[in-house]
Amino acid sequence: MVDVNRFEYMKIGLASPEKIRSWSFGEVKKPETINYRTLKPEKDGLFCERIFGPTKDWECYCGKYKRIRYKGIICDRCGVEVTKSKVRRERMGHIELAAPVSHIWYFKGIPSRMGLVLDMSPRALEEIIYFASYVVTDPGESTLEKKQLLSEKEYRAYREKFGSSFTAEMGAEAVRKLLRDVELEKEVAGLREDLRMIQGQRRTRAIKRLEVLDAFRNSGNNPEWMVLEVLPVIPPELRPMVQLDGGRFATSDLNDLYRRVINRNNRLKRLLDLGAPNIIVQNEKRMLQEAVDALIDNGRRGRPVTGPGNRPLKSLSHMLKGKQGRFRQNLLGKRVDYSGRSVIVVGPNLKMYQCGLPKEMALELFKPFVMKELVSRGIAPNIKSAKRKIERVQPEIWDVLEEVIREHPVLLNRAPTLHRLGIQAFEPTLVEGRAIRLHPLVCTAYNADFDGDQMAVHVPLSAEAQAEARLLMLAAQNILNPKDGKPVVTPSQDMVLGNYYLTLERENAIGEGKIFSTVNEALIAYQNGYVHFHTRVAIPAGVLKNPTFTEAQNEKLLVTTVGKLIFNEILPTTFPYLNEPSMNNLQEATPDQYFLEKGTDIAAEIKSRPIIEPFKKGFLGNVIAEVFKRFETTETSRMLDRMKNLGFKHSTRAGITVGIADIIVLPDKQEILVEAQDNVDRVMKSYRRGLITEEERYERVVKSWNDAKDEIQSRLMKSLNRLNPIFMMSDSGARGNASNFTQLAGMRGLMAAPSGRIIELPIKSSFREGLTVQEYFISTHGARKGLADTALKTADSGYLTRRLVDVAQDVIIREDDCGTDRGIRVTALREGTEEIENLYDRLVGRTAFEKVVHPETGAVLVSTNELIDEDIARAITDAGIDNVEIRTAFTCNTSHGVCKKCYGRNLATGNDVEVGEAVGIIAAQSIGEPGTQLTMRTFHTGGVAGDDITQGLPRIQELFEARNPKGQAVISEIDGQVIDFTESRDKRELTIQGLSETRTYTIPFGSRLRVQLGEEVKAGQVFTEGSIDPKELLNVKGVSGVQNYLLQEVQKVYRMQGVEIGDKHVEVMVRQMIRRVRVIESGETSLLPGSLVDISTFKEACKEALRAGKALASAKPVLLGITKASLETDSFLSAASFQETTRVLTDAAIKGKSDYLRGLKENVIIGKLVPAGTGMTRYRQIGLEIAGEAPVEADSPVE
C-alpha cells in the first residue's frame, strides 16, 4: 500500500497496452466464474485463484499448502501463491483482445476527442468503428483522399478501378492506423499558424482541436492508446459474487459484462483461426466492440444491455457516477465504527456542555476502553474474559464505564447537517432508558425538536481528536452563529416565556410601593403572598453591591420589581442592574430615573410612572451577546444555564396555558367588514360603468380587503389585555405572532389560489367563530401549497449548499497579509429609500484599508489595516461618515485562499481569524443553511406584467449560477444623457447621448421605465424595472461593478426574509465565481487562445514572458456560475466527485493532469488529513505529550 502522506500529487493519464499488461497477474481466458458443484473458482476464469490470489488466507487452491509458514510459496500443483486473501482486492487480470476496440469515452464524449485529433466528424467515426463504411488509410497512387469514407459499393468500384494500389479498412483498426499517422508537432504548429487568420466557427473548431492536440503533446499520452488492444479486468473482490440463502448467487453486473466480452472475444479468435468469411468476422468484431462499450459505459451508445427484468446493467462508468457511485458513496462519505443513534428527549437539568447517553449505548460505544480498564484494574484476567463480562452485563462494569467516559467527549450530530453547528461535542453522563438527552439550548443550532427526532453519536478516539473536540467543538464554545456572529444559543419558547413573565410589571399589583431592606426580605415577602413578581417595589441600591452604581446612587432607593431582582441574580456581578430592556441600560449603566431619594413618597411616585416593557426574546439575545463580548465562553455558558433554569421554573410557576376563552372576538368587527364591502361595491360599480380597467378593479378590491384586515388587527392589538396568555406568548417571542392572533380572533383575510394569484373573496370568519364550507375550501389551497413548497424547498436548498461547498472548498486562510493595493468602498445597502443593511453592520469585524479621520475633530478613528470592532464602527457612524474603504476577499491576492487581513474577524469566535480556517466551507454553509427559510414562489403582485420579480431561493440560485434573470432589465453601456424616447406600434426606443457616441436601446413592452427625459445616466444604470444580467454588467462596469452587484442582490433576498448573513461569506463565494479569465491573444506564452485559466496561472505566465522579454498574453475576466466554476477547478478529483464524472476524467486523462491536493475534497478522497485547521503543514509539528498513559490534559469546562 502507498503511504498517503508521502506523495505530493496524483496524476491521471491514458494507459498503454504495455502498462495494462504490467498491472495484470495473468490473462483471463474463460468466461466461467465458479464451479457449480465445488463452488470454487474456475481455472483461467473471472475469479481464478492463480491470477487473482487465494480465496482463503494462506491456503492454495488444491490444499497442498496450508498455514502462514508457507507464505510466498507458489504451489507447484495449482500455481496459486500462498498469501492473504486480501490481495483479491488489488490484483488485476487482463483480456488479450483478438481485434482492437475503441474506448467509448474518447470516441463518444462531447466533444469527441478522437474526432478532434483526426479532424473527422463523430458521425464518420461511428460509421468506421461499427463497420458501416470503409476509410481510406493510404491513397497510394489512386485519386482518393486520405480519411475519405467509402460505402461497400464504392469500395468495390474503386477496387476494380485501382486494384490494390490503395488501402481502405474499417473498424477500430483503421482508426488506430489513422491515429498512429497523426504528427502532433506538425499539426499543433499548423493550427497555431491558422488561428492568426481564421474567424468565426472555423476558429472555434481550431481552438478546440488545438487544445486536445496540445494536451496529447504535453502529457506524453499517445493518441493511439484511445484504441484498446488489451482490456484490464478489475480485481474479483470489487465485483463480488455472494451466495444467498436459497443457494442462488448474487453477482455484480460487471461479471455479466466481462463474460459477454470474453465469449465474443473467444468466438472471434476461433473464427479468425478457421479463416471464416470476412462478413462474419466483421460482424463478430462489431459485436466485440459493442460488448466492450457496454462494459465501459453501458447505455452511452444505442440501447443499454439489460439483465433480468429489463434492468440496464451497471457498467464501470456507473460505478463512479452519481450519489451511489464510488466517489460520493465510499470516498467522500464512509460509515464509521464507534457510532450509534437514538431518539432524543429534553435534558433540562444538564449543563451546557453535557449530554445524556443511554447506558447500554455508552457500554457498546466505549467497549474497548472498558475492556482495557477492566484488565488494568485486575477485575478481569484477560481481554477475552473482560469481553465476556461486558456481554453478560455484570454489575461491576458500570463503575468502570463511568470512569472511562469521564473527560471523554462524544460528538452528537443531527441530520441534515446544514452548518458546522450540526455536529457538536458534549461530555456524556450516563442515563437510564434508551433515549439520548439533549440540552434545550442547543436545539436551535441543531434545528432539533423532541417530536421524535433522532441523533447520531460518534466517539473521537485519538488523543488529538479528543483534544480538538474539547477545545473547538464543545457546545459551550459554540455560542455564536458563524453566519452572522450573533448568539445562536438564545433561549426559546418556555424559557423566553418564563423570563418574560418574571420581568413583567403590573399596575396596582399586591403590595405596590413597599420598601424592602434586602433582596432576601423581598423574596420572603413574595413567598408569603405579600407581594407578587410583578409588584413594583423599592430597595436600597447599596444592598445590591453593584459596581456600576455611583456613590450617589448607592445612597438612594432603586425602584424595580421582585421579578427583576430575581432575574438580575443570574447576571455576572460586574453587569449594570437591568431594569429596562434598553441597550443603554445593558451596556452603560442603570438609568438615573429609577433611583429615588430616601424619604420620597414611594407609593405615589410609583403610581405616577408608566409600566416598563418586560424582557423579550430579542433583548435576552442582546444580554447573551454582551456577556459573551465581556467574558468569553465559560461565563456565558454558565449564565445561559442559569437563564434556562429561571425560564423553565417561572413558566411552570406562571402556569400560562391557552384556552378558548382567551380568544376574544372583536366587538366592532362587523362595522369594519360592512365598510369594506361598501368600498368593494363602489369599485365594482365604477368597473361596470367602464371607468376603471379589470386590473385596477382587481387591485382595488384586494387592497380594500387587506386594509380591513389591517384595521381589525390594529384594533385587536389595542383591545387586548396585556396579561392575555396568547398575547404574552406572541409578545415575548415565545410562539406565534400578531397575524396568527388576527386569524384566531379577527378574520383570516384573503387567500392565494394554487396559481399564486390572490382570490378576491375574503374569509371573513375567524377560527374562533368557525369557517363556512366555502371559506374552509379556499383555505385548503394555501395549506397544501405550504406543505408542497416545504418539501421542494428542502431538496433545492440542499443541492444549492452542495454546489456552494464544492466551489469554495479550497478557500482557506493561507497567510497573514497578501499586501494587496486595493480595497472596496462600502456604504449602507439601500433598496430605493429603504435601508437593507446599515453601514455599522457592514463594518464590524472588517479590516480598514485606509485610515479614517473624524470629519470635524480630525481625530484618527481607525488606522490602516486595523480591525474595526463594534466601538470603532459605532464611532464612525456617529461621526456621520457614510462610506469607508475596507479590505475584502474580492481584492485579496492570496492564491487558493484568502489572507487574514482581507477576511477580518472570524464571526464564530469574535476574534481574528486563524490561518488554516476553512472559510470557504463556512461561507457555503452560512449561505446554504438559511436557504430552507427562503420562499420558493415568485410573488405575484396583482398580476401586473414585469412586476413579477423572482425572489427567495430561485433568485439566489439565479445569482450564484450567473443565469440570465427572468424579467431582465435594460442597462446603459455608456455615461450620458437621455435625449429621446420614441414609442411606435412595434417598438419602444430610448436614446442616450454620450460624450463621443449616441446609443439607442430597445425597451421591451410591458416593462416600466426608471429614467426620464433629460436625466443623466451612468454606465451600468438600469433603464427599466427588473434584474440585471451579471454577465452583461461585467462587460460594462468591470469586475468590481459585478462583484458589488452580486453581493448587494444576495443580501437583498436574505434581508427581506429577515435572515442576516455576514457580507464576507457572500464575498468569498462571488470571488470564486470570477476567478477565471479567458485568453484572447496568447502572445508568446504557453497559454492557448480561447482557453479558461485561473487568474493566478495567467499572471504567472505573463511574469515568465516578461522575464524572458517575450510578448505578453491578453485576457478578459469571465463570470462563471457556481456549477461551472466547480467543474473548472484545477483539481480533477474534486470536479469528478461533483458532477459529470466521466467527462471530467476523460478530459483529465488526455491532458495528463496532476492533482496537487490543495483542497479539502481531494484529501478526503485519498484519505489524508484535510489541509485546513490543524491539518495544515504549519501545525503538523505540534504533537501531544501523553504523560504515562493519561489522556490528553485539556481544561475541562468549569462548573
From Swiss-Prot:
Q: Looking at the keywords, is Zinc present? A: yes
**Cofactor(s) for this UniProt protein:** Mg(2+); Zn(2+)
Chain sites annotated for binding Zn(2+) 2: C818, C892, C899, C902
Q: Which residues are recorded as binding Zn(2+) 1?
A: C60, C62, C75, C78
Describe the reaction catalysed, as an equation.
RNA(n) + a ribonucleoside 5'-triphosphate = RNA(n+1) + diphosphate
Enzyme Commission code:
2.7.7.6
Instruction: Write down the top EC class of this protein.
Output: transferase
Entry note: cofactor = Binds 1 Mg(2+) ion per subunit.
UniProt-annotated binding residues for Mg(2+) = D449, D451, D453
Q: Name one GO cellular component term.
A: DNA-directed RNA polymerase complex
Check the record and name the InterPro entries matching this protein: DNA-dir_RpoC_beta_prime, DNA-dir_RpoC_beta_prime_bact, RNA_pol_asu, RNA_pol_N, RNA_pol_Rpb1_1, RNA_pol_Rpb1_3, RNA_pol_Rpb1_3_sf, RNA_pol_Rpb1_4
> Which family is this sequence assigned to?
Belongs to the RNA polymerase beta' chain family.
Q: How does it assemble?
A: The RNAP catalytic core consists of 2 alpha, 1 beta, 1 beta' and 1 omega subunit. When a sigma factor is associated with the core the holoenzyme is formed, which can initiate transcription.
Q: What is this protein called?
A: DNA-directed RNA polymerase subunit beta'
What is the organism of origin for this protein? Exiguobacterium sibiricum (strain DSM 17290 / CCUG 55495 / CIP 109462 / JCM 13490 / 255-15)
Q: List the top taxonomic levels of the source.
A: Bacteria, Bacillati, Bacillota, Bacilli, Bacillales
Q: Which gene encodes it?
A: rpoC
